Amino acid sequence: MMLLLAQWLQGMSSELGFLRVFQYLTMRAVLAALTALLIGLAAGSWVIGKLMALKIGQPIRGYAPQSHLSKSGTPTMGGVLILLSIALSTLLWFDLSNRFVWIVLLVTLGFGAIGWVDDWRKVVDKNPEGMRSREKYLWQSLIGLMAALYLVFCISENSNAKVLELFISWMRSGFALDLPPKAGLQLPFFKAVSYPLGVLGFVLLTYLVIVGSSNAVNLTDGLDGLAIMPVVMVGSALGVFAYVTGSAVYSRYLFFPHIPGSGELLIFCAAMAGAGLAFLWFNAHPAQVFMGDVGALALGAALGTIAIIVRQEIVLAVMGGIFVAEALSVMLQVGWFKYTRYRYGEGRRLLKMAPLHHHFEKSGWKETQVVVRFWIITMLLCLVGLSTLKLR
């Protein structure tokens, strides 16, 4: 919005040439981060007060660690503050004609809506489990598949008109259309090496990345500040990749696929970082508010969608290693318990408790130790991911 306003004002008077500074992507990214940060800090206390007035307090599951019982009643659904800050800042500073930012915004808000319903049922219906798993996955799958079907052609072509033509060609070809190399699975540490996926393969991968990332971040959000800081770190790193893939010069120099328009995602990533830091101000131990599913599901979906657009799905798994570990810990715990119950008549556990952060709590780590150590690990993993920019 500000970009269009600056361009309009420049056309009105030659004396306003200094407004050309808003054409620089990096400048708008800095302003987006600051805007989201200020919105979050300014509105945070008001949002928390409203949540408390509405008695939207976090119910604690009966099997949670004893140390968590004191958190019962802490306002949840604070993710609304994050999404509000991201949306307002992004709309203010990005190029409104950019299709990639719009799709990320829509996916983020769509998953946020799912999380909102889930949280609402928890606090209003007094059901700690919220939405039924099948219902939640149904809506997640619907949004994920819709995004995947659009992105597979959107990444392959540079305009929406050509996207429609490519879709029609795919239908007429009997669903056997070849995609350009940039739509393949990019292998890190190799120069211009990609594995062809085809349309259906791309759609399946996109669905798994978006839905998987969403639920992985949601599982990680179990301790004060645990999920939000890794989201900020990974999102910021993905912003760097977006800047590179969106630049014809840098992408060619670093042997990355050039995705015209993807650089504008740096604005969204910057806004997400600013909003995340503002939320951390209130979510740091002892937390004044929890983000809830409305925040966790949305932020995870945003990370997954951005990674798909900039073709860094594998790098996302590396940088978001904490999210991957948390999700795997739950799957392995549940799978092993069911297997041993079937095999031996008694369910057994691999971990003291899942997700993984609860295992370390049960092992004697303090909550703040788990959180900060997971932050440190994420920072190191992000550095490994960023090293793939040059180590190819």
From Swiss-Prot:
PROSITE patterns: MRAY_1, MRAY_2. CDD domains: GT_MraY. One of its GO terms (biological process) is peptidoglycan biosynthetic process. GO terms for molecular function: metal ion binding; phospho-N-acetylmuramoyl-pentapeptide-transferase activity; UDP-N-acetylmuramoyl-L-alanyl-D-glutamyl-meso-2,6-diaminopimelyl-D-alanyl-D-alanine:undecaprenyl-phosphate transferase activity. The chain crosses the membrane at residues 29-49, 76-96, 100-120, 137-157, 192-212, 225-245, 262-282, 289-309, 314-334, 369-389. Its EC number is 2.7.8.13. It is an enzyme of class 2 (transferase). Keywords: Cell cycle, Cell division, Cell inner membrane, Cell membrane, Cell shape, Cell wall biogenesis/degradation, Magnesium, Membrane, Metal-binding, Peptidoglycan synthesis, Transferase, Transmembrane, Transmembrane helix. It is a multi-pass membrane protein. One of its GO terms (cellular component) is plasma membrane. Its cofactor is Mg(2+). Catalyzes the initial step of the lipid cycle reactions in the biosynthesis of the cell wall peptidoglycan: transfers peptidoglycan precursor phospho-MurNAc-pentapeptide from UDP-MurNAc-pentapeptide onto the lipid carrier undecaprenyl phosphate, yielding undecaprenyl-pyrophosphoryl-MurNAc-pentapeptide, known as lipid I. Belongs to the glycosyltransferase 4 family. MraY subfamily. This is Phospho-N-acetylmuramoyl-pentapeptide-transferase. The gene is mraY.
